[in-house]
Amino acid sequence: MAHTTKVNGSASGKAGDILSGDQDKEQKDPYFVETPYGYQLDLDFLKYVDDIQKGNTIKRLNIQKRRKPSVPCPEPRTTSGQQGIWTSTESLSSSNSDDNKQCPNFLIARSQVTSTPISKPPPPLETSLPFLTIPENRQLPPPSPQLPKHNLHVTKTLMETRRRLEQERATMQMTPGEFRRPRLASFGGMGTTSSLPSFVGSGNHNPAKHQLQNGYQGNGDYGSYAPAAPTTSSMGSSIRHSPLSSGISTPVTNVSPMHLQHIREQMAIALKRLKELEEQVRTIPVLQVKISVLQEEKRQLVSQLKNQRAASQINVCGVRKRSYSAGNASQLEQLSRARRSGGELYIDYEEEEMETVEQSTQRIKEFRQLTADMQALEQKIQDSSCEASSELRENGECRSVAVGAEENMNDIVVYHRGSRSCKDAAVGTLVEMRNCGVSVTEAMLGVMTEADKEIELQQQTIESLKEKIYRLEVQLRETTHDREMTKLKQELQAAGSRKKVDKATMAQPLVFSKVVEAVVQTRDQMVGSHMDLVDTCVGTSVETNSVGISCQPECKNKVVGPELPMNWWIVKERVEMHDRCAGRSVEMCDKSVSVEVSVCETGSNTEESVNDLTLLKTNLNLKEVRSIGCGDCSVDVTVCSPKECASRGVNTEAVSQVEAAVMAVPRTADQDTSTDLEQVHQFTNTETATLIESCTNTCLSTLDKQTSTQTVETRTVAVGEGRVKDINSSTKTRSIGVGTLLSGHSGFDRPSAVKTKESGVGQININDNYLVGLKMRTIACGPPQLTVGLTASRRSVGVGDDPVGESLENPQPQAPLGMMTGLDHYIERIQKLLAEQQTLLAENYSELAEAFGEPHSQMGSLNSQLISTLSSINSVMKSASTEELRNPDFQKTSLGKITGNYLGYTCKCGGLQSGSPLSSQTSQPEQEVGTSEGKPISSLDAFPTQEGTLSPVNLTDDQIAAGLYACTNNESTLKSIMKKKDGNKDSNGAKKNLQFVGINGGYETTSSDDSSSDESSSSESDDECDVIEYPLEEEEEEEDEDTRGMAEGHHAVNIEGLKSARVEDEMQVQECEPEKVEIRERYELSEKMLSACNLLKNTINDPKALTSKDMRFCLNTLQHEWFRVSSQKSAIPAMVGDYIAAFEAISPDVLRYVINLADGNGNTALHYSVSHSNFEIVKLLLDADVCNVDHQNKAGYTPIMLAALAAVEAEKDMRIVEELFGCGDVNAKASQAGQTALMLAVSHGRIDMVKGLLACGADVNIQDDEGSTALMCASEHGHVEIVKLLLAQPGCNGHLEDNDGSTALSIALEAGHKDIAVLLYAHVNFAKAQSPGTPRLGRKTSPGPTHRGSFD
């Protein structure tokens, strides 16, 4: 198959990349005998000539080498793989024509630009238009091998070919429509994908295989275009027999007659096409003249635009002026407008800015349209010229190969040779023409300037706005049409109702009009005179009167003559008519009532006549005033005639009217009422069920999430004061206040005032931080006494705050008795716990036994430290008074020795609640640090003074708490090891619980407070503090809730001197409400996982990128980590939830991809979670709303099928399973046996799952691959209750048979389940009559869409 070439400067990237310098050399010398040619038709012809001649072509090939330097070969810098291409044109050209050999490739390539599309994505065809400008860049191939002389055998063959071509020409001309393609695929080296119907199927050869055999492998272009020709012509197919002799000096002679026949057929078609192309060539000069005229017109218009268009015009519309070869954008816009509107070039510079923008946008659009038209016209001209030149060459080649030297062909060839030489010469001319045409738009040259980009952007915006406008217009038209249709329907209904009412009205006036024969005329006259009154007062009365007027004249004409007989006869007819039109007569009565009321409103003069009207309808005697139509006529002397008329028809008409109306009203009301009720019931059932079932689950899940989050935050913040409502804001406010105090370096009075203002809760909010700590320190050991005065003690004692100080009542700095008694008790207890711990560690770990060699000496040192610390604190407590506590100087002097070591630890963690004031003070200079310590301690005196007396146990707790955290009074400093329960996520991984480590274990704490003080604590002292803290926390958890509330404050105040306030707050939360507050660690993705997720996010929409090596590594990492976290039996729901949140934060697409990852068996995390009964994880996965619930593993099972087999114990788990059923297809079949989830649940006796599946719409009658149903499975396994449940379903079919012809009844009998057989027998035989209607009943009474039966 000939190869398609592109002559533009850009080619496909792949081919361009492959063509390196070495390959260029190969393309320069591809025509030696030893080298494969790579172009099939050329080889075939060479083989054909060699077979006939049986000669040797080595000498001619040497001649090719000598002649090659004469061919113009520029630098191999052309970007595509076209540079060294020698198409198969030469093999079909005459062996004696040298002009075919000099530059055949370029002309043919020009024609190939317009060939059919190529499979490998080339650059757009617009970019290939300037191909005429690069003839010098083409490397022209050497001439094809030629014969030095014709022998007799060749001449005979060519003559025979000529004869057969002439014979078949008539046949070919019979169906000219089949050969409408402009070029042939295999003739003349065109390389197109022409699919000529009559030549498609000859020679069943594989194109890909042929490429490998015959294609030039060194060239990336040739193989890349093979897929573009799936339907090649027969010539190209037959030529594929020939690659065997492509590079052999002695060719293989295996040419078949079919091969020759194909060549003849191709040449016949080419000759026919040549004539068509000659006709097309004649139109080229005309088109060129048109182009020149258009270009001249363009230049004139551009000059006009330059004179008329102002520079500010473009600035308003936001588009810069663009420079084109034929003028700027604004000029071209105006040019297009001039062509369309006949030269309207005037621009109103005084228009509003908005209109200017719209005009400029429209001009840009018109400019683009003009550019496209010009481009299409030039493309058409160039294509026609290219086709003509190439086809001339093709036909010449055809003549030279197959026809020989007959006169007709020679004449044609001479003619075409001349045109072809003209084409060669005209290449330069075309180059100039192309340059002129290309100058219209730079985009045609492949150059995208910034101006073009802006134009494109505006064009896209215009197009999008057009589409929106179009859509809105369509919607508007549809809406308008619907409204008009609705109005027409309403008018039709109203007209119909009016017709009906008029008919009924016609009957009524017949009775009345007889009495008012003469009055009608008078009434007409009076209506005209009284129209003003009616219009001014009430508009409705006018309409009613007009209706009455129209009806009465008709009645008058009928009843003028015989009055009495007509009255009687009409009464009888009226009875029948009232039966029919009962409802309508009722409406008429209503209308008449409204008429009367309106008449009353019209004028006070006519009230007498109005009363007469009402009486006239109810009582016949008042028909004397029957001038109803003339209610206004009572003023005029027309009373005489109505009286006469009234005496005639009074009795009969009134009775008939009253009876008819009474009969009609009940019937109408009953019918309407029943209809309305039915409709209401139908709509109510459907809407209510749907809304309740669909919306309830969503709301509940949302509330649960929000509630848990808010509750944790609220409790954490509000523990100290008990003020739950003010907690959220006060927490953050306190921490801010701490920062302010730290920077201010102020004393006690100032910080407390700042606290009070910023917290927004009042003075008590900040002071409670101190008071809670003080109170709780004091209260921790004596629950009963301190709980009573809890509130008073909190608010009464204040440190450095004047408002709080005012509330103190008679402070008595008396120290409670028996402090040391309680202290000794707790010291002993601590010693015991330490000894027990060392003993256990030494027993369990032999390597630690040596480290614990002298436990008693260590205990003694620890004991001495505790006692010294506590005694110093005790002395301060005894000596300090409330006034001294408020005095910063006193605290600095008295407690300076105790503090000093705690500065670094206190100021590291910013406190949230009560600890914030203390932390703010402890971060001040050392002398103020002493005050922060002394403040809680000395305030103990003020606190118990209000209580009167404190129990020794309380004081002991206080001392112990102070001693635990003040044990660094000597040379060593203790680091606080208490960790936050939730783990500060931004800190360096604080532990979740307290560390319990042996004294000499050498454990290094990981608390977030890195010591900033000058002294550093030894690991031994750290461990000691750990050991002390752990049992104390255990002990306090055993106390009741009130004691916990106090002990929490007791710990907090002591910790404030040594630790961060954040730690104190979380201790309060932990101890005060341990059963409600849940504080846990947050699991975060590792750096490796984060990088993998980010890489997946960037390439998730690119299938090719997902298959790269790096992406496979990242996906393996994600899969391994995800299944490790989510798919194990021991998976942690909290961890899974954190991972899901992390994936969703990165990208919803990443979350969807990761959650639906499947392992080698096709199982996802949802499969594993259901199999392991980890229903909390199932809930998390379902809440993510990205799970593919219907995903089947390799065994064909979905998570719903696995859930049908799971064991569910808790009610909440069952709800999760039901939610899973509702999210997927409960009727999906397994790929292996075709079983559904209902069959699996029935087979394993899971009745709860059966109920859930049936509630979610599972079909009872689905059959698996063996024909079995769920009822058959239940009958076979003997599940009686399940059988009853299935039979109770609407539409359960007990007659179904499996592939063996067995029914559920026969299966139950074979298995020996007699009770089930009885049930089935009764259902099959006694429920036959009801079974057809059962599905309908189920459809009517179904409570909602999720509970419908299978046939609903």
Swiss-Prot record:
The UniProt annotation puts motif Important for binding to TLN1 at 41-44
The record's annotation in SMART domains points to:
ANK
Q: Where in the cell is it found?
A: Cytoplasm, Cell cortex; Cell projection, Ruffle membrane; Cytoplasm; Nucleus
Which residue intervals correspond to the ANK repeats? 1109-1146, 1161-1191, 1195-1228, 1233-1262, 1266-1298, 1300-1329
- Motif location (Nuclear localization signal 1 (NLS 1))? 65-68
Spell out the residue ranges making up region: KN motif: 30-68
Which ranges belong to the motif Nuclear export signal 3 (NES 3)?
Answer: 613-622
The effect of residue 44 to A is: Abolishes binding to TLN1 and impairs CMSC assembly at the focal adhesion rims leading to increased microtubule growth rate at the cell periphery
Q: Where in this protein does the record say Phosphoserine is found?
A: 186, 325
Sequence motif Nuclear export signal 1 (NES 1), location on chain: 43-52
Task: Please name the GO terms that the record assigns under molecular function.
Answer: beta-catenin binding; protein-macromolecule adaptor activity
Q: Where is this region: Interaction with KIF21A?
A: 1073-1352
Q: Where is this region: Disordered?
A: 1-31, 63-103, 914-951, 979-1026, 1331-1352
Q: Where is this motif: Nuclear localization signal 2 (NLS 2)?
A: 979-992
Q: What is the effect of changing residue 1197 to L?
A: Very weak binding affinity for KIF21A
UniProt keyword annotations, A-Z: ANK repeat, Cell membrane, Cell projection, Coiled coil, Cytoplasm, Membrane, Nucleus, Phosphoprotein, Repeat, Transcription, Transcription regulation, Tumor suppressor
Q: Which residue ranges does UniProt annotate as crossing the membrane?
A: none
One Pfam family assigned to this protein is: KN_motif
Q: What does this protein do?
A: Adapter protein that links structural and signaling protein complexes positioned to guide microtubule and actin cytoskeleton dynamics during cell morphogenesis. At focal adhesions (FAs) rims, organizes cortical microtubule stabilizing complexes (CMSCs) and directly interacts with major FA component TLN1, forming macromolecular assemblies positioned to control microtubule-actin crosstalk at the cell edge. Recruits KIF21A in CMSCs at axonal growth cones and regulates axon guidance by suppressing microtubule growth without inducing microtubule disassembly once it reaches the cell cortex.
Protein name, UniProt field: KN motif and ankyrin repeat domain-containing protein 1
Q: Which organism is it from?
A: Homo sapiens (Human)
Source organism lineage? Eukaryota, Metazoa, Chordata, Craniata, Vertebrata
The UniProt gene name for this protein comes to KANK1
